[in-house]
Regions:
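Short, acidic/turn-prone active-site loops that include or flank metal/cofactor-
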Residues: 34-37, 81-84, 105-106
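Rossmann-fold dehydrogenase core element
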Residues: 75, 90-107, 124-132
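Rossmann-fold NAD(P)-binding glycine/threonine-rich loop
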Residues: 67, 80-101, 111, 115-120
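Short hydrophobic/aromatic-enriched beta-strand-loop microsegments
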Residues: 28-29, 73-80, 99-101
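Beta-loop-alpha module in the N-terminal Rossmann-like domain of NAD(P)-dependent dehydrogenases
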Residues: 49-71, 82-87
Length: 185
């Protein structure tokens, strides 16, 4: 049985807990969450040892999850979005000591879409690109981590300027722009 420590108890955290509850080979042993000001232990399990950390927390809580995994010397799976460049760099450094798996979206469909964007970008690099995403009203980051990943694929060579939203009289669109729009509702 794999004893999991879960950081983040929102929609994904609850889904992970529910999935683990029906499996005989894994158990969510501890749950840590963020109340807006501090990280607290929402559930303390009976197992003496943790064997993996799953982090689907708010980006402000991610440092605690990574620190916990490093202190326990156990693997960490990270699905938290909105991470800073420094936090991503810290994960890369941690990967020299423990297994780290990070993605802004673990959906197989998004993996395929990212591959298709990368391939299309090879042939359509001179086309005007606007990236527009729509999410539910409870989505906390805008643009989402998935949209940011797609944006980084579209601008791998850093030759384009990202323009977030447009308002008023903006003039002619530059050829080296990528428009980024996030809708919630």
């Amino acid at each position: 049985m794999i004893n999991i420590t879960l950081f983040g108890y929102g929609g994904m955290g609850r889904a992970i807990e529910a999935a683990a509850d029906v499996r005989a080979d894994m158990s969510v042993n501890r749950i840590f969450d963020f109340d807006g000001s501090a990280v607290y232990c929402a559930r303390e399990g009976k197992a003496l040892s943790d064997e993996a950390v799953i982090d689907f927390s708010h980006y402000t809580m991610h440092d605690e999850a990574l620190k916990y995994a490093l202190e326990k010397n156990i693997p960490i799976v990270v699905g938290t979005t909105g991470l800073s460049d420094e936090q991503i760099s810290n994960m890369q450094e941690a990967a020299e000591h423990i297994p780290v798996l990070y993605s802004t979206n673990y959906s197989y469909g998004i993996l395929i879409m990212n591959h298709l964007i990368r391939e299309a970008n090879k042939y359509l690099s001179e086309w005007d690109v606007e990236l527009a995403e729509t999410h539910h009203s409870k989505k906390k980051d805008a643009p989402s981590g998935t949209a940011k990943t797609m944006l980084s694929i579209l601008n791998e060579d850093n030759s384009k300027t990202e323009v977030y939203g447009r308002q008023g009289i903006t003039g002619e669109r530059s050829k080296r722009e990528i428009g980024v729009h996030a809708l919630r509702g």
